[in-house]
Amino acid sequence: SKPTLLFVGRITRQKGLPYLLKALHLISKDIQVVLCAGAPDTPEIAEEVKIAFAKLDEERGNIVWIEEMLPKPELNALEHGCDAFICPSIYEPLGIVNLEAMACGLPVVASATGGIPEVVVDGETGYLVPIDQLHDGTGTPTDPDKFVHDMAAAIDKIMADPELAKKMGQAGYE
């Protein structure tokens, strides 16, 4: 069984899914990825994500897109079957989704923005991906390529060490 990374969220600019889809091109092809992503807030981002996913699926495989928001029991079962959680948000006041993943014993790789650093302890319960952002209210990274590369590196790091991932997941659960 391959190590599995999970993303759960709506398809919005704030959730950072387009950056994640770029980062996934850079990670080990041995990592299976599950995207539980639905409810796009605009037709434009829906199309952007659809095109990016198709390209990613063609180039690397090992990726599944569940295009609906799952009921809580199904989502919990999915989380328990994964090895790590990714939260690439560029705007996130708190990030309840990270707490939910941690409650399932998953280590979290997340953007160091908003309230996320209050939840994810870098190096203990997961990894925080540094992000310098424009101050225009959008949360857009000032250096998108660096953000994407740093995210990919953090994903590879946590997925390459199952024992560390389990330890971080346990620390987050506690």
Language-model region placement:
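Short hydrophobic beta-strand element within catalytic cores of glycosyltransferases
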Residues: P107-A110, V120, Y127-L128
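A conserved mid-protein helix/loop that constitutes part of the nucleotide-sugar donor-binding site
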Residues: P3, T12-L26
